[in-house]
Amino acid sequence: MSRTKGGTVTHARHKKVIKAAKGYYGRRKSTFKVARQAVDKANQYATRDRKNRKRNFRALWIQRINAAVRSHDEALTYSRFINGLNLAGIEVDRKVLADLAVHEPEAFGAIVKQAQDALAA
């Protein structure tokens, strides 16, 4: 039986890794062994940061909402505002609230007023 060499398969696998390392600096873009390590580490970072992106955006939305709420009423805090929304039965998520606070301050002010009324009642 003749010997089977894996040249084409190995070449394709190496080429895939080198292609993924395009734009890297030094041997990280051209040498298979180093490129594979760099690509593996990049994939670890990408996986981790897909999770962190969700946390970061939620934190950003909360900061924006808190700043907007305090600009409408100095005494009202973020947590009391969210409590007021729950008491008023307003079910708007933080992403939409932050967008309203930035782009439509008048509408956000009306929501703040409803939350204050619910807290007072």
Curated annotation (Swiss-Prot):
Signal peptide: none annotated. One of its GO terms (molecular function) is rRNA binding. PANTHER family: 39S RIBOSOMAL PROTEIN L20 (PTHR10986). Binds directly to 23S ribosomal RNA and is necessary for the in vitro assembly process of the 50S ribosomal subunit. It is not involved in the protein synthesizing functions of that subunit. SUPFAM superfamilies: Ribosomal protein L20 (SSF74731). Keywords: Ribonucleoprotein, Ribosomal protein, RNA-binding, rRNA-binding. GO terms for biological process: ribosomal large subunit assembly; translation. Disulfide bonds: none annotated. Belongs to the bacterial ribosomal protein bL20 family. This is Large ribosomal subunit protein bL20. InterPro entries: Ribosomal_bL20, RIBOSOMAL_L20_CS, Ribosomal_protein_bL20_C. It comes from the Bacteria. GO terms for cellular component: ribonucleoprotein complex; ribosome. PROSITE patterns: RIBOSOMAL_L20.
